[in-house]
Amino acid sequence: MKKLKTIFTILLFATIIYSCNNSTGIVVSDEENAKFQAQIETFKTFTNGFYNEDIDLLMSVMADSVQWSPPNYNGNQLINSDGLRAAGISYFESFDGITFNEGDGLVGSDNGFWSGSLYSAGETNTDPSVMRVYGTWSMTHTETGAPVSNKWYGVLTFNEDGKIAVFSDWMDVNGMQVQVNNYVESNKQ
């Protein structure tokens, strides 16, 4: 009887511990998923603007009041729509075949788009209004023909119209010039 009581007590505690640790997953609504998929398409339009060197296509997905934090350090100053447009044109003048490869460079995943999360405050969130994007930009330096590639990470906040309202991105901007310089050095005759 004592053995049976011990087994019962162990099973009872195991059940209590399991039920306390067994949390249900967060359910993403169909509306949130549709919004997330639309935002992925918005970002793909942005990257197609780079590939096609079409500044109007690139800017068509940006809110008029967009605030951009560029990948290069600039004293943490936000850049407006005009500055973003000028930067896009500068890339068009310097590079050809600008292509974004979503998820490229991630370890253990090829998914380049993420939204919703468990934040440091411990709160879970399924709202897709803020999207993280990971991937690699590949291009050819126009003047030298140097192939250039850069791992990239961006955080995009979308407004109610589905346009990008806040945009922060990170990549090794100086590494692009290093790749060009290395290419030129290795191809000297």
Regions found by a protein language model. Name each.
Residues 11-13:
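Short, linear, compositionally biased motifs with a strong N-terminal bias
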Residues 5, 21-189:
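C-terminal and inter-domain tail/linker signature
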Residues 15-19:
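C-terminal motif of bacterial Sec signal peptides marking the signal peptidase cleavage site
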Residues 1-8:
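Bacterial N-terminal signal peptides that target proteins for export
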